[in-house]
Each structure stands twice: as structure tokens, then as C-alpha cells.
């Protein structure tokens, strides 16, 4: 068989079009800049989180109250048309977290029940009372309030300082692993209606990263056996994507891309804490069973 005509490259020597090469380089540059922006946001946030966790006690609880108030403000702003009962939400948040600081999980449950008649009473005197407003306020209390209350409960357990850090490490390492894994290897959409950019491959890599992150952190804590660290890591790995997808659903229903602008292009407090609100709960019950 005759070879390719002189002057014309054969099939193996063909190069992709210049436009394709340029778009590939631009995509890689965007990925690097996006990762850099994530790190710029993450470093000061991690420093503040570590300071609160190490301080513990009432300082940690007050920090969670402030963080919860910011998260509630973002949620209520997204659902402003429902007329949420802001005062009831804030009072309930403070009650839940103080119950966690000075009581047990039973007292947290009592506070969650006690806030319901307060919510109904404040709804009646609102200018625009609505069932939708009650629903949004209750969602804020039982999503944001319960999640942060369990973070306080977790901090109060034996070795709570280290376990809270382990849960945060697993959550954020898993999130970063899912992001990078999805960018590099993702082909199959995970939940296209909720979050088009999430992939099955990213989910798997993120879960593996979360388990390994907690296990690796546990190797420097002689009071945390390897099997306990693996179980805790698995719980974090399973809970984190559920929290992420739940928040994506909330944003989709509200018709918004980000919950706020606290972290600039990387969204609001809820965008950064969506997974933590679930992993703190799971982490508490796993460690409470061991402790």
C-alpha cells in the first residue's frame, strides 16, 4: 500500500486544531486560578475555625451562634418571599446552642420543641404571616441550628477538640478531593438537576479522600485507634455529599447560584458549611458511641 502523499501528514501525525489547543490551555489556567482562589478563601477560614475549636467552651459556642446567624440570614434572604420569622429563628438558634453548651442532646431536643410555640406566636403578629414562613424558619432551625448544636456537643465530648478537627479535616479534604477528582476524571453526572458539575467519579474520589484524611489525622492522636478513625472517616465521607446535595437542592428551589457573597466568588457561609452541618451530627453520634 502506498504511503501518504508527500507534503500531507498521515493520520498519526495530525495535530489538534489550534483553537482546541488554546481552549485546553485556557481550561487548565481557569482550573489553577479557581483552585488558588479556593485556597485564598480557605486559609483564613481554617485559621479562625482552629482558634474557635482550640478555645472551646463558651467562646466556641458564641462563635457557632455568630456563624449560625450568618447562615440563617443567607437562607432567609433566599426565601424572603416566604416571609420567614427571623426573630423566632434567631431565638431558637441561641436556645439550641446554649442547650448544647450547658446541657445534653436531650436538652437540645427540648429547646427545639420549646421554640415551636414561640414561632407560632411571632408568626401571628407578623405583617405577612404565612405557612411558608413557618416552614422556612423551622428548616433553618433544624438544619442550621441542629448541625451547629451537635458541633458544640461534639466539642464537649472527651477529646472533643481533636475529634472536631478530625471531622473538619475529613469534610474539607473530601470536598477538595471531589472537586479535583471531578475536574480531572469526571465524566458521569451525579445529580444533574441539582448540581450539574458534580460527577460520580468526583464523589468516589472525595469519599476516599475523606476516609484517608480522618485516618491519617488519627495517626497523630494516640487516643484514636485506627479502626475508630476509619469508622469516623466513613461516616464523614457518607454524610458530606448528602449535605452538599441538600444545599444544592435548597439553592435550586430558591433560584440562586450562591447563598451569599461572604467569600466573594466562592459564595456565602452556607456554601462553605453545607457539608459540615451534616458531618458534625454524624461525627457526634459515632464518637459518642465510642467515648
Outline where the language-model segments fall.
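Interfacial loop-to-transmembrane junctions
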Residues: 88, 253-276
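Acidic/Ser-Thr/Pro-Gly-rich, low-complexity N-terminal segments
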Residues: 1-29
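Membrane-embedded alpha-helical segments of transport systems
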Residues: 177, 204, 270-280
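Hydrophobic transmembrane alpha-helices of multi-pass small-molecule transporters
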Residues: 210-211, 275, 279-280, 288
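Juxtamembrane boundary at the C-terminal end of a transmembrane helix
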Residues: 285-291
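Membrane-embedded alpha-helical bundles of polytopic integral membrane proteins
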Residues: 25-234, 238
Amino acid at each position: 500500500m502506498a504511503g501518504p502523499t508527500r507534503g500531507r501528514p498521515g493520520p498519526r501525525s495530525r495535530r489538534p486544531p489550534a483553537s482546541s489547543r488554546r481552549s485546553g490551555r485556557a481550561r487548565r489556567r481557569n482550573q489553577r486560578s479557581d483552585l488558588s482562589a479556593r485556597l485564598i478563601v480557605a486559609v483564613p477560614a481554617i485559621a479562625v475555625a482552629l482558634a474557635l475549636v482550640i478555645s472551646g467552651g463558651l467562646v466556641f459556642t458564641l462563635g457557632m451562634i455568630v456563624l449560625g446567624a450568618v447562615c440563617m440570614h443567607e437562607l432567609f434572604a433566599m426565601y424572603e418571599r416566604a416571609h420567614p420569622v427571623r426573630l423566632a429563628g434567631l431565638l431558637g438558634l441561641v436556645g439550641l446552642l446554649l442547650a448544647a453548651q450547658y446541657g445534653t442532646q436531650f436538652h437540645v431536643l427540648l429547646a427545639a420543641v420549646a421554640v415551636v410555640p414561640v414561632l407560632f406566636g411571632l408568626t401571628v403578629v407578623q405583617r405577612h404571616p404565612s405557612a411558608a414562613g413557618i416552614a422556612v424558619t423551622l428548616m433553618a432551625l433544624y438544619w442550621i441550628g441542629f448541625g451547629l448544636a451537635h458541633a458544640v456537643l461534639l466539642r464537649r465530648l472527651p477529646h472533643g477538640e481533636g475529634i472536631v478537627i478530625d471531622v473538619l479535616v475529613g469534610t474539607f479534604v473530601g470536598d477538595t478531593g471531589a472537586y479535583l477528582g471531578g475536574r480531572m476524571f469526571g465524566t458521569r453526572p451525579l445529580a444533574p438537576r441539582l448540581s450539574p458539575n458534580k460527577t460520580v467519579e468526583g464523589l468516589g474520589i472525595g469519599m476516599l479522600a475523606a476516609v484517608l484524611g480522618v485516618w491519617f489525622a488519627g495517626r497523630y492522636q494516640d487516643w484514636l485507634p485506627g479502626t475508630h478513625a476509619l469508622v469516623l472517616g466513613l461516616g464523614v465521607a457518607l454524610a458530606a455529599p448528602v449535605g452538599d446535595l441538600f444545599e444544592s437542592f435548597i439553592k435550586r428551589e430558591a433560584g440562586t447560584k450562591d447563598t451569599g457573597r461572604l467569600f466573594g466568588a466562592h459564595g456565602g457561609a452556607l456554601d462553605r458549611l453545607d457539608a459540615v452541618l451534616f458531618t458534625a451530627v454524624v461525627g457526634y453520634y459515632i464518637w459518642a458511641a465510642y467515648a
